[in-house]
């Protein structure tokens, strides 16, 4: 008996590394030192920073991976992995520097995993961060053959005196919601149940344009890094930012607010994506569960002074993003434990 007969093909692993080399190298920033294959990745800090602070974030794609693998869609989840990490770290005003990935699988499937890496590289290129390294672990008996899990890790940098942490937010500030492009990478344990209950297959369509439902569900998570960097480079005084992921607006928006303040949301200020009507009807899901699970059409939020809200919305539009004024900051009602007002709890 040898390692290969036990289920681990070292030669296939080496071939896979060579296969993805071009995709990885396409993401390289000028600060990167050396190439892939070493025990660690090396990168200089960008020039001109006086008091640089590193910001780190890690995340996965969750059970969206199960649906993606069922339908042979691998490229998009690579973008998802980057977006889930990058969208988190940019809420501090930081610039993404590098990304690391971890892939665990029962049996190495080069075609599928190459698509994943190509998606990760695309996400990194959109974010202007380097795919500095990664690990692919073949774990027979732990994962089923052909199934895989993903984890990502991102490091960004920000000047210490430019960190955005919500500390300047005050009563009356406006909350700007940026449109999401779908479910992103949250709530898929519930979505998969509804998909099964509704008998969804490859031919199932959604909406007036008859978009394949699976394509809509698996649409890669929107990256907001280009927009945020454009806003900051224009010196728009953004006071706080929130990436709307698992837990929806009720859980994520308060994370950027100082103690004692709450977000008052007007649900009529943006159009609810029609997919939620389908989800409601097919899954018989309570309204509060929907709001506390999904982004409901808002993928990212920014908090600004009232006199800056129009300029911010206009700049979002100029950069290809739809934005709405969805509410304002208020004092947290003493009798309420929740720090969000106007949404089902």
Swiss-Prot record:
GO terms for molecular function: ATP binding; phosphoribosylamine-glycine ligase activity; phosphoribosylformylglycinamidine cyclo-ligase activity. One of its GO terms (biological process) is 'de novo' IMP biosynthetic process. It comes from the Bacteria. Pathway: Purine metabolism; IMP biosynthesis via de novo pathway; 5-amino-1-(5-phospho-D-ribosyl)imidazole from N(2)-formyl-N(1)-(5-phospho-D-ribosyl)glycinamide: step 2/2. Its EC number is 6.3.3.1. It is an enzyme of class 6 (ligase). NCBIfam families: purM. It catalyses: 2-formamido-N(1)-(5-O-phospho-beta-D-ribosyl)acetamidine + ATP = 5-amino-1-(5-phospho-beta-D-ribosyl)imidazole + ADP + phosphate + H(+). Pfam families: AIRS, AIRS_C. It is found in: Cytoplasm. Belongs to the AIR synthase family. CDD domains: PurM. Keywords: ATP-binding, Cytoplasm, Ligase, Nucleotide-binding, Purine biosynthesis. GO terms for cellular component: cytosol. This is Phosphoribosylformylglycinamidine cyclo-ligase.
């Amino acid at each position: 008996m040898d390692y290969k007969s036990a289920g681990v093909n070292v030669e296939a692993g080496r071939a896979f590394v060579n296969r993805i080399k071009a995709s990885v190298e396409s993401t390289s920033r000028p600060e990167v030192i050396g190439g892939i294959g070493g025990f660690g990745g090396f990168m200089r800090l960008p020039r001109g920073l006086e008091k640089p602070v590193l910001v780190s974030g890690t995340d996965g794609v969750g059970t969206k991976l199960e649906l993606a693998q069922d339908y042979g869609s691998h490229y998009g989840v690579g973008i998802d992995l980057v977006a889930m990490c990058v969208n988190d770290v940019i809420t501090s005003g930081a610039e993404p520097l590098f990304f690391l990935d971890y892939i665990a699988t029962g049996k190495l499937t080069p075609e599928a995993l190459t698509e994943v890496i190509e998606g990760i590289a695309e996400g990194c290129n959109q974010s202007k961060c380097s795919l500095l390294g990664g690990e692919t672990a073949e774990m027979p008996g732990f994962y089923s053959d052909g199934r895989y899990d993903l984890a990502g890790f991102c490091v960004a940098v920000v000047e210490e005196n430019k960190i955005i942490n919500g500390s300047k937010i005050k009563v009356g500030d406006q909350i700007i919601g940026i449109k999401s492009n779908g479910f992103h990478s949250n709530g898929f344990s519930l979505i998969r149940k509804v998909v099964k209950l509704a008998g969804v297959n490859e031919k199932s369509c959604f909406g007036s344009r008859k978009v394949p439902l699976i394509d809509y569900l698996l649409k890669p998570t929107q990256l907001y890094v280009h927009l945020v960097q454009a806003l900051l480079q224009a010196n728009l005084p953004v006071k706080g930012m929130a990436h709307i992921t698992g837990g929806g607006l009720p859980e994520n928006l308060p994370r950027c607010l100082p103690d004692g303040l709450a977000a008052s949301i007007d649900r009529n200020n943006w159009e609810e994506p029609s997919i939620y009507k389908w989800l409601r009807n097919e899954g018989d899901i309570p309204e509060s569960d929907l709001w506390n699970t999904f982004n409901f059409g808002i993928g990212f939020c920014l908090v600004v002074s009232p006199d800056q809200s129009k300029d911010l919305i206009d700049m979002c539009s100029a950069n290809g993003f739809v934005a709405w004024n969805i509410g304002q900051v208020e004092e947290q009602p003493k009798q309420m434990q929740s720090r969000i007002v106007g949404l089902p709890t």
